[in-house]
């Protein structure tokens, strides 16, 4: 089989033929320039133009210049005709071809490192060379399909986080994105947040999805609460589909009631419905208590149902996502908000949603709710003049989040609101398992940049091969006659074949990737690895300082226990330093009732970490006083007890400050 593409040999032959045709046309002009007569026809020669050239007669004549113009014009016409005929023959079965780097640079998809503003998908050369990087150009959304250990993290996700000039909300399944890129994001001016509700050390920032609804006017709260319920509560199995609407109505009524009570959190909704007793009695009581008409209506309807039906509603509500808030960690992480969604387009922000692979399925309702709520808020209004940053949703392990109906709809519209999606999955079958065929095609048709790394499933290679298309080639067949030894027949025909067959996709080497860009030919590129790329490695190694870890989150029971321990330590330290009873020190002219009331108020302040600022006591003075009373100093106690005693001395300073606050100033020392 011989390909019909234009080769240098064929191009040279075409030029020779076109020049020959032009020379003949010039000879005709030289012969018949005075008219078509019999004498001219008798003397015609194909070399007539040669006799008019300076090489033959020694000087240029007007006939020579006219003939030269005829040669050039004829050659161009012949070459264009041959090219058109060749292209028509080749387009008969397909025109698929690989894109050239030059045309991709001209289209704006290949950029030098210092001009990259969007995601990074690949590179035109090896890691040690100054090549161009592939970005998304005018395409807002992208899809990365790569199996495990194929390099999507080191080649796409981390380079994107290191270079993207805008706000990023990244699903960090392993927690490594925060460790590897958070310092770079912070040094570039980002406000960095780590939302990790199930972190073993409770180091997480907080986000309360109900606060946005509580801040809305009352007439809009019901609609937004219904949207929140649809995003959070999903049916688990076909048996739950008949009760999902009632379960969502219950959730809506619970949110409205908690907002009315001044506890706008999903944890408060869980506690509200987790109360013991008959559910119909609870709903009847809530209907009487609530002033919100929609909440009253829902609770009234629920109170009139049979106990079994109510049990089904509450069961579907819990299994659909609300039971996640039985975990104290989740309750605490959603009790307040440390960042505002309304600021994401106004100032650069990076939010890492950190969760371990084992907890991803468990915490998926919360992550799903956060993503969909941010999308909903972004689409409430067009970006203002001060909202100049784009928001990139980096969805790694997209499949495990479940069905995201809000994102499925928003992918067609959110680009106008400065929103971008990057979906990362292991194979196209992951979309088939979560979305129906229409939803899957919606994602594929709206992701303008699709990056594929070597995959072994059946669906993905077939999709890539069909998406790239076929090219036309010339097939040559030879047949021989049995009667005569040297008698044979040769037939040449145009046929089509895939530019890249499915089996070739499976054999793609570990350093290459295939990129499909809407409106452009397919592109084959080198993968990027940030740790070996000369530019990205420099950016990664420039990170300095500690990780921007949030403070350890305090749970509700911890606050109560810390308050009790705080007061116990005060009493213990007072006795150890020989200060006697606090009541006898503080009670100076006050009645016991007044003194106890004041001390109780002060103890409440101590329990929540608020201390009296009126008097400051230096620790050195406290130690001197302790030494005067015969108490062993810190230096004389065992080393393992020194930190504890130092903390107790600080508590003592606070106690003395309280004592001086509640007694008149006297020059006599306390005995």
UniProtKB/Swiss-Prot annotation:
Among NCBIfam families, the record links this protein to: PRK13850.1 (NF010424)
A matching Pfam family: T4SS-DNA_transf
Q: Which gene encodes it?
A: virD4
Recorded source organism is: Rhizobium rhizogenes (Agrobacterium rhizogenes)
* Principal cellular location given in the protein's record: membrane
- Respond yes or no to whether keyword Isomerase is given for this record: no
Q: Does the keyword Transmembrane apply?
A: yes
Q: Which residues cross the membrane?
A: 12-32, 60-80, 153-173
User: Which keywords does UniProt give here?
Assistant: Cell membrane, Conjugation, Crown gall tumor, Membrane, Plasmid, Transmembrane, Transmembrane helix
One GO cellular component this record assigns the protein to is:
plasma membrane
Subcellular locations according to the entry: Cell membrane
Question: SUPFAM superfamilies per the record?
Answer: P-loop containing nucleoside triphosphate hydrolases
Recorded topology in the membrane: Multi-pass membrane protein
Q: Which family does it belong to?
A: Belongs to the VirD4/TraG family.
InterPro entries xrefs: P-loop_NTPase (IPR027417), T4SS-coupling_protein (IPR051539), TraG/VirD4 (IPR003688)
- Top-rank taxon, per record: Bacteria
Q: What is this protein called?
A: Protein VirD4
């Amino acid at each position: 089989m011989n390909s019909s593409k234009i080769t240098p040999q064929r191009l040279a032959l075409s030029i020779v033929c076109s020049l020959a045709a032009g020379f003949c046309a010039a000879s005709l002009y030289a012969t018949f320039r005075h008219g078509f007569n019999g004498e001219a026809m008798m003397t015609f020669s194909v070399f007539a133009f040669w006799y008019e050239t300076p090489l033959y007669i020694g000087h240029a004549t007007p006939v020579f210049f006219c003939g030269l113009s005829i040669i050039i014009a004829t050659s161009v016409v012949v070459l264009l005709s041959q090219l058109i005929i060749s292209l028509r023959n080749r387009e008969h079965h397909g025109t698929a071809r690989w894109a050239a780097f030059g045309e991709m640079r001209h289209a704006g998809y290949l950029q030098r490192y210092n001009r990259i503003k969007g995601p990074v998908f690949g590179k035109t050369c090896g890691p040690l060379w100054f090549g161009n990087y592939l970005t998304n150009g005018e395409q807002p959304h992208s899809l990365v399909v790569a199996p495990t250990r194929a390099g999507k993290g080191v080649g796409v996700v981390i380079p994107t986080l290191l270079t993207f000039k805008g706000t990023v909300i990244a699903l960090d399944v392993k927690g490594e994105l925060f460790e590897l890129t958070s310092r770079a994001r912070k040094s570039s001016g980002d406000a960095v947040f780590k939302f990790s509700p199930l972190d073993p050390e409770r180091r997480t920032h907080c986000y309360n999805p109900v606060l946005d609804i509580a801040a809305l006017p009352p007439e809009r709260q019901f609609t937004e609460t219904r949207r929140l319920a649809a995003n959070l509560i999903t049916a688990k199995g076909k048996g739950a589909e008949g009760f999902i609407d009632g379960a969502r109505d219950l959730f809506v009524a619970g949110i409205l009631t908690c907002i009315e009570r001044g506890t706008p959190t999903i944890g408060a909704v869980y506690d509200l419905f987790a109360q013991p007793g008959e559910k119909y009695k609870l709903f009847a009581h809530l209907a009487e208590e609530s002033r919100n008409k929609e909440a009253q209506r829902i609770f009234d309807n629920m109170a009139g149902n049979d106990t079994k039906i109510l049990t089904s509603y509450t069961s579907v509500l819990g299994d659909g996502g609300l039971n996640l808030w039985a975990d104290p960690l989740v309750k605490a992480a959603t009790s307040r908000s440390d960042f505002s969604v309304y600021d994401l387009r106004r100032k650069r922000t990076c939010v890492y949603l950190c969760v371990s692979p084992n907890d991803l399925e468990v915490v998926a309702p919360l992550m799903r709710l956060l993503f969909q709520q941010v999308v909903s808020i972004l689409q409430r209004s067009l970006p203002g003049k001060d909202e100049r940053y784009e928001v990139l949703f980096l969805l790694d392990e997209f499949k495990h989040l479940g069905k995201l109906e809000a994102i499925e709809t928003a992918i067609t519209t959110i680009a106008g609101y400065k929103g971008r999606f990057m979906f990362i999955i292991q194979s196209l079958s992951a979309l088939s398992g979560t979305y129906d065929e229409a939803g899957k095609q919606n994602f594929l048709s709206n992701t303008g940049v699709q990056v594929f790394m070597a995959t072994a499933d059946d669906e993905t290679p077939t999709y890539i091969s069909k998406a790239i298309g076929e090219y036309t080639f010339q097939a040559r067949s030879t047949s021989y006659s049995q009667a005569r030894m040297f008698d044979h027949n040769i037939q040449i025909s145009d046929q089509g074949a895939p530019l890249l067959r499915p089996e070739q996709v499976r054999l793609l080497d570990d350093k290459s990737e295939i990129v499909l860009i809407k409106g452009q030919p397919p592109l084959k590129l080198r993968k990027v690895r940030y740790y070996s790329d000369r530019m990205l490695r420099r950016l990664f190694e420039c990170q300095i300082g500690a990780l921007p870890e949030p403070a350890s989150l305090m749970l509700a029971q911890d606050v109560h226990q810390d308050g009790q321990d705080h007061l116990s330590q005060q009493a213990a330290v007072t006795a150890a330093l020989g200060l006697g009873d606090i009541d006898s020190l503080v009670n100076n002219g006050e009645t016991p009732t007044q003194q106890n009331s004041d001390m109780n108020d002060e103890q409440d302040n101590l329990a929540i970490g608020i201390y009296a600022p009126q008097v400051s006591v230096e620790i050195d003075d406290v130690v001197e006083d302790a030494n005067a009373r015969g108490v062993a100093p810190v230096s004389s106690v065992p080393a393992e007890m020194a930190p504890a005693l130092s903390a107790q001395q600080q508590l003592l300073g606070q106690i003395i400050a309280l004592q001086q606050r509640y007694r008149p100033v006297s020059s006599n020392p306390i005995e």
